[in-house]
Amino acid sequence: MLYNVSKGVVYSDTALQGQDGDREGMWVGAGGALAPNTSSLFPPEPPGASSNIIPVYCALLATVILGLLAYVAFKCWRSHKQRQQLAKARTVELGDPDRDQRRGDSNVFVDSPPSLEPCIPSQGPHPDLGCQLYLHIPQQQQEEVQRLLMMGEPAKGWQELAGHLGYQAEAVETMACDQMPAYTLLRNWAAQEGNRATLRVLEDALAAIGREDVVQVLSSPAESSSVV
């Protein structure tokens, strides 16, 4: 080609060489094989595009944190309210005439089945022990029931009894923080239910969780009874 004096040939060869260079730019050899060069097919990412997403992530994170804080605050407030209601229920006496009115404000703890009819204790030489109120049995008998409920497996303890008496899980967790949860459960149940808090109802709940030993303690006749 160097000895060819024809400029047209030289120019033609130069154009062909330029076309070959363009073809080689579109194909890149990798390990002996040719692969298309796609680096120039997509425009480069504009600078600062990734930095625009950071405020969005920060806003989402702040929303999640505020939601968690609000949830924790609500749980603490609800637990504190339940503790206050439980403390008020302890002070309710059996003969308080306003007990039934306050019972409507404390339904958060116990949900009594509507089918249960109030059992009125019969008077006479042979009263029906099943209709006797729990708070009317002797103090020593109550303490023995509470002691037995604190012993044994949790599935047959006071927690399971609370579920059969209509208490929700949150109320059971609140009572678990007390030093004597079995005492708190039975006293609160007796105060909330009033004339429905009979030995028959309690014995049925105890039998449902397999605590016949506690049922025997309640069924055993006492030498003397006293109103607590």
Curated annotation (Swiss-Prot):
Q: Which residues are glycosylated?
A: 4, 37
Q: Can the keyword Nucleotidyltransferase be found in this entry's annotation?
A: no
Which GO cellular component terms, listed alphabetically, does the Swiss-Prot or TrEMBL entry include?
A: lamellipodium; membrane; nuclear envelope lumen; nucleus; plasma membrane
Any single Pfam family the record assigns to this protein = Death
Q: Where is this region: Disordered?
A: 87-122
Residue spans of biased composition, Basic and acidic residues class = 90-105
Q: Which residues lie on this side of the membrane: Cytoplasmic?
A: 74-228
Localization per record = Cell membrane; Nucleus
Q: Which domain of life is it from?
A: Eukaryota
Mostly located where?
Answer: membrane
Indicate the transmembrane segments per the record. 53-73
Does the record's keyword annotation contain Cell membrane?
yes
User: Which SMART domains does the record cross-reference, listed alphabetically?
Assistant: DEATH
| Keywords recorded for this protein, A-Z | Apoptosis, Cell membrane, Glycoprotein, Membrane, Nucleus, Transmembrane, Transmembrane helix
Write down the Gene3D superfamilies for this protein, in alphabetical order: 6.10.250.1780, Death Domain, Fas
Tissue specificity annotation: Detected in lung and testis.
Q: Cite the SUPFAM superfamilies for this sequence.
A: DEATH domain
**UniProt topology in membrane:** Single-pass type III membrane protein
GO process annotations (BP): apoptotic process; signal transduction
Function recorded in the entry: Modulates NTRK1 signaling. Can activate several intracellular signaling pathways, leading to activation of JUN. Promotes apoptosis. Promotes translocation of SORT1 to the cell membrane, and thereby hinders lysosomal degradation of SOTR1 and promotes its interaction with NGFR.
Assembly and interaction partners = Interacts with NGFR. Interacts with NTRK1. Interacts with SORT1.
Q: What is this protein called?
A: Death domain-containing membrane protein NRADD
Natural source organism: Mus musculus (Mouse)
